[in-house]
Amino acid sequence: MIIDFFGDSITEGAMASSQDKCFVERVGQLLNCTVINHGVSGTRFARQKEPSSEPRFDLDFCYRLKDLNRNADYVFVFGGTNDYGHGDAPIGAKEDNTPDTFYGAVNYLASNLLKMYRKEQIAFILPLYRLNEDNPYGEGNKKEPSLTLEGYRKIICEVLDKYHIRYLDFRNEIGKAENNPLIYDGLHPNDKGHELLANLIVKYLKAL
């Protein structure tokens, strides 16, 4: 079995003490399967209008779709928190299907993933709790106010419901970000948080 994990810094393994503690690698260990980590720190679903200080942050999910393994048995897409945090793409309209708006990027990802895999093979993981998630300026650097993190989550759910693609919400299991023993810095899970994420994903897969 081959599982692709498509994500940002959490998928990449940020704040895990070593790569083998990252939830992606833990899933591979627990299921004795091949896992492919497509996590790139700082990346967003939607395309950035103004270049980021770190160029790799602008390797958006829509651009990186081409990197996924079409022979994978399952693909998990875990993102959206950086669109809230520091993305400058407009929210857009429900019917958009372009990487240049958030609605458009989620539509683009969903519609193109369905060209690559059966819908039963695809699952999105919704953004987890994070500190200051109710700030319409995200991490504080947005020039224009936008949605809270919950607003971005609702759009992801709305679009995926339209395409009948599964999504997993682990927020309650991981818990609020503040003073959470599973969260390192108000956003990224620590080793224990990565372990719980892996166990939740394995539980989902075994129930299919």
Model-inferred region functions:
Residues 2-4, 12-100, 104:
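Conserved SGNH/GDSL esterase-like catalytic core that processes O-acyl groups on lipids
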Residues 9, 81, 128:
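Residue-level signal for short, function-critical loop segments
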Residues 65, 106-110, 153:
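Generic structural signal for well-ordered alpha-helices
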Residues 76-78, 121-125:
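Conserved, well-ordered alpha-helix/loop/beta-strand core segments that scaffold catalytic motifs
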Residues 87, 127-208:
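Catalytic His-Asp segment of secreted/periplasmic serine-dependent ester chemistry enzymes
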